[in-house]
Amino acid sequence: MKMRNFFLLILLLPIVLFAGGRPPDRPEVRAIWVTRFDYKSPTDVSSIIVNCAQAGFTDIFFQIRGNGTAFYPSRVEPWAFELFGKDVSKTGTNPGWDPLQMAASWAKRYHVRLHAYINVLPGWRGFDSPPRAAGQLWTAHPDWFMVDSTGARMKPTSAWYSFLNPAHPQVRSHLSQIADELARYDIAGLHLDYIRFPYDYTDVAREVYPNASSKEIKAHSVFSFDPVSLGAMGRSASRRKWDAFRRKSVSQVVADLCGIFKARKANAVLSSSVLADFSTGYHEAFQDSRRWVKEGSVDWLVPMNYNARLFDERLGKMKHALGRRATGGKLVVGINCAGDAREIRRQIEVSRRAGCRGFALFAYSHLFENHQPTVKGEEVIRCW
């Protein structure tokens, strides 16, 4: 009898150990974000991939689209000026090399998974307009952008974006073409960021409306009252119906991109950054991330859990919203590396104890300086 109970315990042990989350057959995801500001040359790209691989990261979110411009030869968007510095007039200038192709080649050589990382809805940033000859969205398709409740097109600020309207069918078609282009590269997945409504525009709107009252700032921060959306909803629809419409519009873009990308790469990983607070994401940014997971539009959900004080609480709420099974298979926790190494290591351990699929660190520049590991970077990677 005792022997039978012993063998029963052995059989049940894996279930007990992994009841909290990640199954034993799914290795930990250790991802890192590399932003478009981290590289300007082929040497930068090769150094980044080698550093990340040798540091033990399994996945790299490598940014190749920031605000309606591309860091690869695209048929639908002009080259990004950032490869040349800060001169907006360089928009559309071919740098003579393909950062995404180079990153993909180095990633394959060093056996690390590379994900094309795109800002989905940002269409332009900054006060200077791109040259008209470049055909950038801000000048070529002004009607594709969100419109505030006063009827004004959303204005970018010095460091903030103007967002494309996810309800516009031509916007969805355009973004789908980008996903199709990216699926032709030898990469592991597609990573989505800024796939939401700009719920926080009130924080920056005063830069473009310096003399506006608080009430006027609020009016300039509610989106989108464009002709397409008004045609579908009208102005008399309730807030609840408007919110549902906005949420559905964002979810449709996620589903579109997933469908297009996986039509060419069935085994690819579709991941998305989302707000760390599930309720804020759902009610204010209109991210129905639980639906994305349930319907299979995303394989990994990456909440940007960047507030150290609220880290544990927000992780707990996200885990509760998704459920145990989705947490272990889908939840990759985003961790901000701007703080000290001890706190970063603590958050990694909290994520592990919660049974998450893994974690993603933001960002490369916090762990490497001039492509050399910082003291903080060396301390952080010692925990795996």
Q: Predicted regions span which residues?
A:
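The substrate-binding groove and active-site-proximal loops of carbohydrate-active enzymes
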Residues: 31-39, 79-96, 158-173, 239-249, ...
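Aromatic-lined carbohydrate-recognition surfaces of secreted/lumenal glycan-active proteins
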Residues: 113-121, 191-199, 236-285, 329-340
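Catalytic domains of carbohydrate-active enzymes, especially glycoside hydrolases
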Residues: 45-70, 185-189, 297-300
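Aromatic-lined carbohydrate-binding/catalytic grooves of carbohydrate-active enzymes
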Residues: 57-94
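Active-site-adjacent "subsite" loops/lids of carbohydrate-active enzymes
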Residues: 25-30, 39, 121-185
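Substrate-binding cleft of secreted/luminal carbohydrate-active enzymes
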Residues: 297-314, 318-321, 327-384
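Aromatic- and acidic-residue-enriched segments that line the glycan-binding/catalytic groove
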Residues: 72-84, 122-155, 195-233
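Substrate-binding cleft/loops of secretory-pathway carbohydrate-active enzymes
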Residues: 122-126, 200, 264-310, 346, ...
